[in-house]
Regions:
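Structural recognition of the beta-strand scaffold that forms the well-ordered cores
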Residues: 55-57, 62-65, 74, 183-184, ...
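M16/insulysin-pitrilysin zinc metalloprotease superfamily fold
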Residues: 72-88
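Conserved catalytic alpha/beta cores of large enzymes that bind or transform nucleotide phosphates
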Residues: 102, 216, 221-222
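Internal maturation/activation junctions in enzymes
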Residues: 5-9, 24, 36, 84-197, ...
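Long, well-ordered, tryptophan-enriched scaffold segments
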Residues: 1-63, 68
């Protein structure tokens, strides 16, 4: 392909081999043999999309985040809640400051569990979740000196998704391996930030390819 059509043709041929050729067949077979859900159609029909990021503002700063196909909206949701407090007056990393940040994140993560999904397959009420009115209602669940021992109930952001889902259930947390995060800052102000848990014991190498499914992808059989 490179000889006949140059670099562009070579890249197309490489993509075809990965998504619909012999490499794709090997990947799909590995998933199938291990009880996974990935199919040949999933591979061949995949296309990268260009989309507008979510946008919000906090303290005069514009914030852009990925859409609800991942947990990107959690941060703007949490900041929308925190916009109702004077964190500067609370003092950086004081008990009050930390309490407010943690409780806001709990509320945002509760909505993530309830509402987030791929917009190509489910209607996510993102405009409501990021609206000041919704944040004001949810903010009432943050109480001074009192913390939710687990995730609080999700908010009522409309029935677009809610009508299709069962009521949330609560139970004892199950100890398990989870995301590892490392952040180090030295005395000169140099920072290192990494989330090294994507490749783990749950992401085996697919034989003959040198490739491993992501931790998210391997969840279809682990």
């Amino acid at each position: 392909a490179t000889t006949k059509g140059g670099r562009a043709a070579g890249l197309k041929a490489a993509r075809a081999a990965f998504y619909s050729g012999d490499i794709a067949a090997t990947i799909v077979k590995y998933h199938r043999d291990n009880g996974g859900l990935l199919s040949a159609d999933d591979m061949s029909q995949f296309r990268v999309r260009f989309e507008k990021p979510l946008r919000t503002t906090y303290a005069g700063v514009e914030l852009y985040a990925c859409g609800p196909w991942c947990q990107g909206p959690v941060l703007p949701q949490a900041l929308s809640l925190l916009a109702g407090y004077d964190l500067r007056a609370a003092g950086h990393n004081t008990p009050e400051y930390i309490h407010l940040v943690i409780e806001a994140l709990k509320l945002a993560f509760a909505d993530r569990h309830r509402y987030y999904g791929d917009p190509n397959f489910v209607n996510v009420p993102m405009d409501t979740l990021l609206s000041p009115e919704y944040a004001a209602r949810r903010r009432q669940m943050i109480r001074s000196g009192e913390a939710w021992p687990e995730l609080p109930p999700a908010g009522n952001a409309g029935d677009a998704v809610q009508a299709k889902l069962p009521d949330p259930t609560r139970g004892e947390p199950v100890p398990a391996a989870d995301t590892s995060y490392v952040c180090v800052i030295d005395r000169f102000g140099n920072g290192f930030s990494a989330t090294p848990s994507d490749a783990s014991s749950e992401t085996p190498v697919i034989p003959g390819t040198g490739l491993c499914p992501s931790s998210r992808g391997s969840q279809s059989w682990c």
